């Protein structure tokens, strides 16, 4: 275990030279789990392999039960090797966010170091942008973008229909990891946030599959990702119900509510 309370479990031994011009896409649990579902979907579509897990002593103090098997809450890095050897992809997600601001800094700082060691040149973080429901286009959610580099931001805006995030705070690891990676290692980062109903900020049971899919489509177009699976508006409701059932079971297993009081929860609206 490291001095920061993080235990590393490696599944592959690798050298930095094993990966070709890699990028990193991350999505941690947050509002409506928009970023996390997008990453989970990418993991399945790319058949990504697990590189390493991280067990952290600031994650919820409970065990996850899946098919009668116990596991600890964790963050994980997976990888996909481009068969054309042009650009490999690292994917990062987690079962939970840290319970304290200090914990979020510790895990974000640690993951930014791992990303740097993997010779990543670009970090793409995915999350939610809560807005009043009356302002949401019912067909396609808008995507808002910010970046650690102004030139990168302008180039991205020029070739997409995304909106700039003028001001605000991106709370949680989705915003902190690319920010720390830029400050410490001069790695470029982009944060893409799909708009969702702001009721999700006070109702943790809400998921927004449409927003997650919109992020996936943007990734596919902007970064030429090999995403083949198509979702239709007709089956979104069924998929959302299945996703919600899994989320409810995970929350029940973790039983986090007894460890976080109402005031702390109000301060921790992770995007």
Stretch-by-stretch model annotation:
Residues 1-106, 110-118, 132-271:
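Accessory terminal and edge-of-domain segments that mediate assembly/interaction
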Residues 121-122:
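Structural motif
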Residues 127-129:
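Short, ordered loop/turn segments at secondary-structure junctions
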């Amino acid at each position: 275990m490291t001095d920061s309370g993080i235990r590393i479990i490696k599944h592959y031994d690798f050298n930095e030279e094993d990966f070709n011009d890699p990028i990193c896409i991350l999505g941690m649990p947050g509002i409506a789990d928009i970023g996390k579902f997008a990453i989970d979907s990418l993991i399945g579509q790319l058949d990504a392999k697990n590189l390493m897990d991280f067990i952290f002593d600031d994650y919820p103090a409970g065990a996850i039960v899946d098919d009668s098997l116990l596991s600890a809450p964790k963050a994980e890095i997976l990888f996909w090797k481009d068969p054309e050897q042009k650009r490999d992809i690292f994917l990062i997600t987690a079962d939970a966010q840290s319970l304290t601001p200090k914990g979020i800094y510790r895990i974000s700082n640690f993951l930014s170091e791992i990303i740097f060691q993997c010779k990543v040149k670009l970090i793409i973080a995915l999350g939610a942008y809560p807005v009043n429901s009356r302002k949401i286009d019912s067909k396609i959610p808008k995507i808002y973008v910010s970046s650690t580099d102004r030139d990168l931001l302008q180039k991205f805006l020029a070739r997409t229909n995304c909106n700039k995030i003028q001001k605000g705070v991106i709370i949680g690891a989705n915003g902190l990891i690319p920010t720390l990676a830029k400050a410490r290692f001069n790695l470029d980062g982009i944060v893409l946030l799909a708009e969702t109903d702001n009721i999700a900020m006070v109702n943790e049971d809400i998921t927004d599959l449409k927003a997650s899919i919109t992020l996936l489509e943007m990734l596919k177009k902007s970064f030429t990702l090999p995403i083949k699976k198509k979702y239709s508006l007709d089956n979104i409701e069924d998929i959302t119900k299945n996703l919600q059932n899994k989320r409810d079971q995970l929350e029940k297993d973790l039983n986090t509510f007894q460890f976080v009081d109402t005031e702390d929860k109000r301060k921790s609206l992770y995007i």
